[in-house]
């Protein structure tokens, strides 16, 4: 539970986030990857290049600030993001790294306007929000392990490719260990993580499951 003073301080930063949120998140990602290049194995590099990830994070941070006194209001957003995090293998230990770099970016962009009180308040708020994400994601990880499922990634092999049209190709895959797979439900997708020739880091792409 956040103190009222912390809530008031966070809400007071909303105008600054509205004005500088995108700059903060761009700075955040630059610092994050410079200091932790291994995280490039997790994040979608195409979304980074096109600025989608920076914009999405800026909107999320702003929403958290605006609803810091009623975080239940952002639970639907948290759940949506948590599903994506689970699909990419985001772990609890990543949140400490992200938090440190987010606070650093806020200070770097806002300068003297980011007082010690503001940085401390955002540190406390981030801790609460991170705990919510970690809890939701752990539930998702546990659910993914049920009925033939697995946590994180599993090796598959391509057994068949079918060109359905000029734009669509169906890829049929089977687990390397030969174990049976859980039955997929409508709307589910799978993250394919693979090495790509000429690329230094792993590439992640989400694909819709059409048959299980």
Model-predicted regions and their roles:
Residues 147-212:
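Ferredoxin-reductase
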Residues 1-153:
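Globin-like tetrapyrrole-binding proteins
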């Amino acid at each position: 539970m956040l103190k009222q003073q912390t809530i008031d301080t966070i809400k007071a930063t909303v105008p600054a986030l509205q004005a500088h949120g995108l700059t903060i998140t761009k700075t955040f990602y630059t610092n994050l990857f410079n200091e932790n290049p291994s995280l490039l194995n997790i994040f979608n590099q195409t979304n980074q290049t096109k600025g989608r990830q920076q914009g999405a994070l800026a909107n999320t941070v702003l929403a958290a600030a605006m609803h810091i006194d009623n975080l239940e209001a952002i639970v639907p957003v948290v759940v949506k993001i948590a599903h994506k995090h689970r699909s990419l293998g985001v772990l609890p230990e990543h949140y400490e790294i992200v938090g440190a770099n987010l606070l650093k970016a806020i200070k770097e962009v806002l300068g003297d306007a980011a007082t010690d009180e503001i940085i401390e308040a955002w540190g406390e708020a981030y801790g609460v929000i991170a705990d919510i994400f970690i809890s939701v994601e752990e539930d998702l990880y546990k659910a993914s392990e049920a009925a033939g499922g697995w946590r994180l990634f599993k090796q598959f092999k391509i057994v068949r490719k079918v060109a359905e049209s000029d734009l669509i190709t169906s890829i049929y895959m089977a687990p390397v260990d030969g174990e049976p797979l859980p039955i997929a439900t409508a709307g589910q997708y799978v993250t394919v993580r693979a090495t790509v020739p000429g690329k230094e880091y792993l590439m992640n792409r989400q694909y819709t499951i059409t048959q299980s």
